[in-house]
Amino acid sequence: MIGLNPEMRLISPMLDRAVIDALFPADLPEAAHWERRYPSRQLPGSAQVTRFGPSPTGFVHIGGIYVAMIDRDIATHSRGVYLVRVEDTDTSREVAGALTQFARAFDYFGIRTDESDEHGRYGPYRQSARESIYLTYVRELLRQDKAYLCFATKDELADITARQQAAKIPTGYYGSWAIWRDADPAAVQTKLAEGAPYVVRFRAPDDAAGQRVRFTDVIRGELEHEANRNDTVILKSSDQSPRLPTYHFAHAVDDHLMRVTLVIRGEEWISSVPLHRQLFDALGFKPVTYAHIAPLMKQIPGGKRKLSKRADPEASVDFYIEAGYPSAAILYYLRGLANGRLAELPLSEALSTPIRLDQCGVAGPLVDLVKLDDISADYIATMSGPQILDAVRTWAAQFDPDLATVLDTEPDLALRALAVERDGVDNPRKDLHKWSDFRAAYGFFFPQLFTPLSGSTDERLLPLGVDATITASFAQDFADGYQHLDDPQEWFNQIRELAAKHGFAASVKEYKKNPDAYPGSIREASQLIRIALTGSTRSPDLHAITQTLGSAEVLRRLRTLSTGTA
């Protein structure tokens, strides 16, 4: 086993400063340089500086938008600052295109940062570009003997873990198991001379074992956790370039220098607070305040679980963007999950009312797509026809180019279609939950998108149970005598009179009394016309549809019902 035997550790003096400094670039600034470069922010006393730290290791989780939305809201309403800092220190897991997807997601939801590399004095805002900053503070901890070089190999670390498991004690790199914690400086220099790769580990306080740490969480109140006793890696292996820190160390350095005051993050980080407090203390930084958000959940048989990137399509922000959910509806829904009182307010008021962290629950809220559909439909129902058309065209340009072409060609028809049972009524239609619903709900209005019937035997007619011969005859007579009337009742009387002529019962009640005596009721007769014009048994008012389509198109579709050709 390479290194020092745990039973024969030496209590040794720290490395000579010259040896430590030689590990770093000669022109590496001192900590005072960074403190001057990133001064305290001049903000009102109640202002909060928040940040969101996306990692480009995959798609944006809707939970990320949820947290970023809260970050943005807290900063806005406290007259503070919200910033985005890309946490890309794990270069091995970085996914190509992830940052572009982040930008698209944040732009879609209008969650905009107050600072960036172009207009912010606390950058760079990517951790991979902050290497020299981290190295300065790693060097400072080494100089103060609050960190040390560790040459333990993967095999040695695996052996330590196996022995700990066999002894049924907590696993980790701590105490007598931290074989390089108190290594003789001569042994360290020998390893350095050999060119052996090393990491830098934080030296956990000697009295950490068995201690408890109390801290206040803005959402959860007073919490208590076991103190950290592990000598955590703070700087990755020396054989990597660039030399980047782990999340724990970067969090402490970045949030201090960017003058972040409130860290809002997922509850999975609660157990890391003791370590983070140790790091802030070792570095001489004022600790930040934490608010740990409960994760978004999904209902499953017998309970609920976290919304999963791997198992749940709705976990990805792309799911909502590609489906065409209006961003305002999603934000309204998410704000209601954060603070239940906001779900009771009208949308515009809920979007402008501050989110309160003390009203965020500690149990994860359920993501309910049915509820989101209802909210979205209600929101879209408040929009004007031109607003809806503009939104659908914008969405379709990216996700349904054929539909976009049709809408660009037929904007007037689109507006007339959207006006049906929407304009000038107390309860407008709510058939659009998202922009991708437009083709199914309104596509029949457009000849380019509508598939005419293939005749009286078309499968779309089968649910009505009307004889094909009667169907063809009824449709032919209706087309031959069709009048394009403005009055809805007079127009419908055409169907009523022709239905009677072809033997249809005048009412459903009459038909049910003696079904064998009729091919159907006035309902089936009307549905024959509806299917001929729309391809479906469900549609808006038939007369309104004919007024939108125009006489020529109505007749063309009616003739396909009787003959199969226009």
Question: Could you tell me what each predicted segment is?
Answer:
Residues L283-L462, T534-A566:
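Catalytic adenosine-cofactor/nucleotide-binding cores of aminoacyl-tRNA synthetases and other
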Residues I495-L549, E553:
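Helix-rich, typically C-terminal accessory recognition domains appended to large enzymatic cores
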Residues D71, F102, L141, D145, ...:
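Residue-level signal for inorganic ion chemistry
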Residues L4-A167, P242-L244, S271-F285, A329:
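N-terminal Rossmann-like or analogous alpha/beta NTP/dinucleotide-binding catalytic cores
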Residues A47-R51, L83, P313, E349-L357, ...:
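Short amphipathic alpha-helical segments and their helix-coil junctions
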Residues T50-T57, L83-D88, L257-V263, E314-S316, ...:
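Glycine- and acidic
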Residues Y148-H292, M297-L307, S316, K434, ...:
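Active-site cores that bind ATP or allylic diphosphates and position pyrophosphate for catalysis
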Residues L135-E140, Q144-K146, Y198-V199, P205, ...:
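Residue patterns forming the tRNA-binding/recognition surfaces of aminoacyl-tRNA synthetases
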